Regions:
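A short, Lys/Arg-rich alpha-helix, primarily the initiator
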Residues: 1-20
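The alpha-helix within a helix-turn-helix
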Residues: 12, 23, 51
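Key DNA-contact positions within bacterial/archaeal DNA-binding proteins
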Residues: 20, 31, 59
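Recognition helix of helix-turn-helix/homeodomain-like DNA-binding domains
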Residues: 28-41
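Short, basic-rich loop-to-helix N-cap that marks the start of a DNA-contacting helix
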Residues: 39-52
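Short C-terminal boundary/hinge segments that cap the last helix of small helical domains
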Residues: 55-67
Length: 67
């Protein structure tokens, strides 16, 4: 199973933010951000905090990619 966070990266660009900004605003740890950068799964609670900050839905952030 592979997870793509390309939607999240696009939203960050569209909002003029970088990964560090998102970590500060949501309280996400750098290790969790590294997991997302590497396409690894993270807890739903992390995605919920991101959705709250960026005013979006889960589907805007992640995509399941078949290998």
């Amino acid at each position: 199973m592979a997870i793509s966070y390309n939607g999240l990266w696009k939203l960050l660009i569209d909002n003029g933010m970088n990964k560090g900004d998102l970590c500060k605003k949501t309280g996400i740890s750098s290790s969790t951000m590294a997991k997302m950068t590497n396409g690894e799964s993270v807890k739903l609670s992390v995605l919920e905090r991101i959705c709250e900050e960026l005013d979006c839905d889960f589907a805007d952030l992640v995509e399941y990619v078949k290998k």
